[in-house]
């Protein structure tokens, strides 16, 4: 028998109807008002044919409209396929095709070829139809699909169930605690699992969310000072921006947690936070773990510099090398397990079998545990470039470069950047006449802006080992010598 729970938002609206759910700029919406908005969206989506079990793509920016669509799809029992608004049209079409979506709901102009596109504004101005609302959720059913890229650069749809999202929120509350006055400032895109997880916490905890539609460091800085924010999720770039604006001031003591993800933070940044009394909690997680799976509390932010902490209460973590669990201080692959971990990838049985074995997720990330069990992440999928908190996979950029008629070989690595942490740099072996400008322009047409290499260098040949595998470490050395 499948385990079920009451529809989360319906239950929250029943329990605390008049409590503020969402604040966006000057607009405030209670949980009951949010529920009523969602029912209306649900009825309009039902009229255009959205049904239980279907997969529906969502291409929207942060805002009340996106929140209501995500909840409305769960009300009708459809699976929300959340698309990154920063991707190119080609990338989006590929993901929609791969996910077998029946339609796209969006707040922007988009031609999806063979898939019906519904502008939310037009849908809401049209007729509505009584909807069959799911009053219970089965924890085993898929709620969302979010695309991530493996080391091959091929996107994979991570299936996250209601149970995964529930376990993630419970684990976070056991880790960070809950207070009646908690308010989480949400500035992460909701198409990322980190942003989406805040919507889950919002209705499960009954916690106020202050939603920032678009990243604005000045607004966020002021909000932390004046809007009663107690928790915020950030990456290093955001934290640096906030410290610059803070100057000699400090944030209110009510700000009890800065949850820092997107890779290890530099020690000077953490030391500055200690000086300012800012409690930074470093985290490690991924789409496959429904957001964080490890967190380093502020108590250890300087004594365990570089550590991602220990697993959440209901999660397990170990380090393996060649299939064998290794002792502390020995490097190996980070392997995790828990109720927040995905059961697999959509239509990727081989990748699922390779990645998840006996319930343990093989992350592909390298790290080690110290003698006290604190995790240190050494390399995120070894080749991964993390730029402003966004994951960039070199193989995807290389695939685009190799599609250019004048490119014979291509290799991409991360290059240090003061603003973004890292940006892509490309190395190309030419097969015909082509300039650096032409290469970069070609990439701009095929890739999201943040994935476009900031530099393209030409080589006679790329460094490879005896089995002809690309030696990225040598490319990184070339970047450092530039």
Swiss-Prot record:
An example Gene Ontology biological process: menaquinone biosynthetic process
Keyword check for Signal: no
GO terms of molecular function: ATP binding; CoA-ligase activity; o-succinylbenzoate-CoA ligase activity
Family annotation (InterPro entries): AMP-bd_C (IPR025110), AMP-bd_C_sf (IPR045851), AMP-binding_CS (IPR020845), AMP-dep_synth/lig_dom (IPR000873), ANL_N_sf (IPR042099), ATP-dep_AMP-bd_enzyme (IPR050237), MenE (IPR010192)
Enzyme Commission designation: 6.2.1.26
Pathway: Quinol/quinone metabolism; 1,4-dihydroxy-2-naphthoate biosynthesis; 1,4-dihydroxy-2-naphthoate from chorismate: step 5/7; Quinol/quinone metabolism; menaquinone biosynthesis
Catalysed transformations (reactions): 2-succinylbenzoate + ATP + CoA = 2-succinylbenzoyl-CoA + AMP + diphosphate
Pfam short name (any one): AMP-binding
UniProtKB keywords: ATP-binding, Ligase, Menaquinone biosynthesis, Nucleotide-binding
Keyword match Protein biosynthesis: no
The protein's role, per its UniProt record: Converts 2-succinylbenzoate (OSB) to 2-succinylbenzoyl-CoA (OSB-CoA).
NCBIfam families, alphabetized: menE, PRK03640.1
Similarity comment: family membership: Belongs to the ATP-dependent AMP-binding enzyme family. MenE subfamily.
Name of the featured protein: 2-succinylbenzoate--CoA ligase
């Amino acid at each position: 028998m499948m385990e079920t729970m009451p529809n989360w938002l319906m239950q929250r609206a029943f329990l605390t109807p008049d409590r503020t759910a969402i604040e966006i700029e000057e607009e405030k919406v209670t949980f009951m008002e949010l529920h009523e908005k969602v029912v209306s969206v649900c009825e309009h989506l039902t009229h255009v044919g959205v049904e239980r079990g279907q997969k529906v793509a969502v291409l929207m920016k942060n805002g009340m409209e996106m929140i209501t669509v995500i909840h409305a799809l769960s009300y009708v029992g459809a699976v929300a396929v959340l698309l990154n608004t920063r991707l190119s049209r080609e990338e989006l079409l590929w993901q929609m095709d791969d996910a077998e979506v029946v339609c796209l709901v969006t707040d922007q102009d988009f031609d999806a070829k063979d898939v019906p596109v519904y502008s939310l504004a037009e849908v809401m101005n049209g007729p509505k139809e009584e909807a069959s609302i799911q009053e219970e959720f089965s924890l085993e059913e898929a709620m969302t699909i979010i695309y991530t890229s493996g080391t091959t650069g091929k996107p994979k749809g991570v299936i996250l169930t209601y149970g995964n999202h529930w376990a993630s929120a419970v684990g976070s509350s056991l880790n960070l605690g809950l207070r009646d006055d908690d308010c989480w400032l949400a500035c992460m895109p909701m198409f990322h699992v980190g942003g989406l997880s805040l919507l889950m916490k919002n209705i499960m905890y009954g916690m106020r969310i202050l939603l920032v539609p678009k990243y604005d460091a000045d607004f966020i800085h002021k909000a932390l000072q004046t809007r009663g924010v107690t928790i915020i999720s950030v990456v290093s770039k955001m934290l640096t921006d906030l410290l610059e604006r803070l100057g000699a001031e400090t944030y209110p003591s009510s700000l009890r947690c800065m949850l820092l993800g997107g890779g290890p933070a530099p020690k000077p940044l953490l030391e500055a936070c200690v000086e300012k009394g800012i409690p930074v909690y470093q985290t490690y997680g991924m789409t496959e773990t429904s957001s964080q799976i490890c967190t380093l509390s502020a108590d250890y932010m300087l004594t365990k510099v570089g550590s991602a902490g220990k697993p959440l209460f209901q999660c397990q973590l170990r380090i393996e090398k060649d299939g064998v669990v290794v002792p502390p201080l020995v490097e190996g692959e980070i392997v995790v397990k828990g109720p927040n971990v995905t059961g697999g990838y959509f239509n990727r049985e081989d990748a699922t079998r390779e990645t998840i074995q006996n319930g343990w997720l093989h992350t592909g990330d390298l790290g080690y545990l110290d003698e006290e069990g604190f995790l240190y992440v050494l390399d995120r999928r070894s080749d991964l470039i993390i730029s402003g908190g966004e994951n960039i996979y070199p193989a995807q950029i290389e695939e685009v470069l190799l599609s250019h008629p004048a490119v014979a070989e291509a290799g991409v690595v991360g290059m240090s950047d003061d603003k973004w942490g890292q940006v892509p740099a490309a190395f190309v072996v030419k097969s015909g006449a082509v300039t650096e400008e032409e290469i970069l322009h070609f990439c701009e047409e095929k890739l999201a802006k943040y994935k476009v290499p900031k530099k393209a260098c030409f080589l006679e040949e790329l460094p490879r080992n005896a089995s002809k595998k690309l030696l990225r470490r040598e490319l990184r050395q070339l970047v450092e010598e530039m």
